[in-house]
Amino acid sequence: DEAAAVMGDYKEKTPDLVAAVRDAARQEQFLEVVAVAEARRRFHQHLDLAPLAAETVALAQALGRVFAADVVAPIDVPPFDRSGVDGFAVRAADTAGASDRAPRRLRLNAEVIACGHPPVLQVEAATATTIATGGAIPRGADAVVMVEQTELIETAQGPAIDIRRAVAPGGFVGYAGSDIARGETLLRRGLEIGSREIGMLAACGLAKVDVVRRPKVAVLSTGDELVRLGEPLRPAGVYDSNGAIIAAAVSEAGGEPVRFGAFPDDESVLELAVRSALAACDMVVLSGGTSKGAGDLSHRIVAKLGAPGVLVHGVALKPGKPLCLAVAERKPITVLPGFPTSAIFTFHTFVAPVIRALAGLPVDAGETVSARVPVRIPSELGRQEFVLVALVAGERGPVAFPTQKGSGSVTAFSQADGFLAIDALASALDAGRDAEVTLIGRTRMPDLVIMGSHCVALDAVLGRLADQGFAARTLAIGSQGGVTAAERGECDLAPVHLLDPAGATYNRHLVRPGIALVPGWRRMQGFVFRAGDARFAGKTAAQALAAALADPDCLMVNRNAGAGTRILIDRLLGGTRPAGYANQPKSHNAVAAAVAQGRADWGIAIAPVARLYGLEFLPVAPEHYDFLLVESRKERPAVQAFLAALRDPAVRARIAALGMVPADE
């Protein structure tokens, strides 16, 4: 017939082309179409997905990189007690009762404390010293009065100020280590470095940082139809958009793209390029040549690169069915479909997770989330206010806790997951309200929430959880705050160290229905002072305390109300209020810093912190640092991992090395 005659003529003229047409029409089918989960399992089974080796980079080159190791703060930030406002350093007791009608007058000392200049004069009773924002708090002062709340008065004895509003102890004072405490784990390995982390590193004076090496990802495009960008488009040609898209996606995923360019459907040329890419890079990504149609060579070339070779060729995915996944020389190789939509879809499903794993990055999160606000947040009328919040998982969904480190804090943004807005016409956001939280960067909801007292040994436990892929959120709100959070079901665990009312035992009185007690470790609380202080050297803690109370010039540094250490201090003092009692920082580090820097003469802190600051230490009493467990959360994987870490010999050895004693020893 006519068709047979045409085909016969065709065979005589172009026998090679006829064979090609027959092969194309026949089309070898996919080896096996598998489910997405099975494809991922086969692929990952032959890969080492641990982060790549570390490299050291300058701080200026650290943006977007990933910490390869925990960063421990080498200094306190701030390194000294400092003023948060322009005003006058005072003794808070001297301002009691001050008002517009009955101001309190204080004589001005002959000193102006500017930033960068240590104070010289001590603030005595009924005196004040002019101080700038950021200036060091002088000895004797425990608060700062804003200049706006004062009036300069000339008297026969010299200049003085009338104070029209009282200030509480600690008012407008940023304590040493209140932002960053020396020796604490400041930033953890696996965290992506953004501008917030850069600021924290710079605040600690760190010029270099160890980061995970970015995986080098070779990007190749294949096909006779591809045209270079910028060149005229020829008939039947298309621009190589896949190369540009995939290279950008590699960068977004945390990799370093290496553009090898676009290659024609020439098997020998393409094979040479792929082998060169495999030798030079950590991963190879090709686009095109997966469908086993005419001219599709990529999958055949990949199959020749070595064992185990092609693991998947065909995935039950739309779009993206022609995907090819392979491994050679322990390196991942992927051949993405040629159509851009299919290529980028399969890239984000299969390639991006591998790149992020090699780069040490976590999984991306969404952009906004609705969360309940558990506490009332006051706001100034007439101004829209943005409040930084930390997100934790509550019983009825996300809970947004406002961060409270203040405008001078370096870590406020780093420890926040997002922010919420309070309308200009609202005086507050009431407790219990839901708010829309705008997430900052790549936010991951924590797997474990710990709220209460902080201890450096806790970092050893959380480090083990981080190794297992769990993200923990810790909020240092004191033992009493932890008890409240546990009762409201806002945390998984609450670290506490509180004596019962009779002073006989630690923490057992906090157990109640729904809340169990998990033993932690024991740490020694003691009397800390500077080496060489003859008032305390060679004495017992009781003798040293008696000597301190007998000397009116001997300044103490206290702890904040609600802290377990504060309860111990008040028991030791028996109702007395020695000089410095109103100085109430919120951490052991701040206490040690005050003593070490001569702003106080003694305080109560734990032994490891005393050693860290080079202070003498007189033991007072062992303290039980335990955990309240919200029993409804006990079976959560992260909680079980935490409980297992407490029993882990390596973790226990680390705790012991820090000067603590595990509870059952």
Where are these regions (language model features)?
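Periplasmic-binding protein-like
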Residues: I515-G526, L615-A644
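N-terminal segment of the mature folded domain
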Residues: L465-T540
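Flexible glycine/proline-rich
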Residues: A37-R40, E55-A60, A68-A69, R82, ...
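Helix-rich terminal scaffold detector
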Residues: A3-A37, A207-L336, P340-T346, A460-Q468, ...
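Short loop->beta-strand "edge-of-pocket" segments that line small-molecule binding or catalytic clefts
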Residues: M445-H454, A542-R566
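Short, low-complexity N-terminal leaders and the immediately following helix N-cap/first helix
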Residues: E2-D100, L106, T130, D142, ...
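A ligand-binding cleft/hinge motif common to bilobed small-molecule-binding domains
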Residues: P495-V511, A592-A621
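Short, glycine/charged-enriched hinge/interface segments at domain edges or termini
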Residues: D16-V34, D70, A89-P264, R396-K405, ...
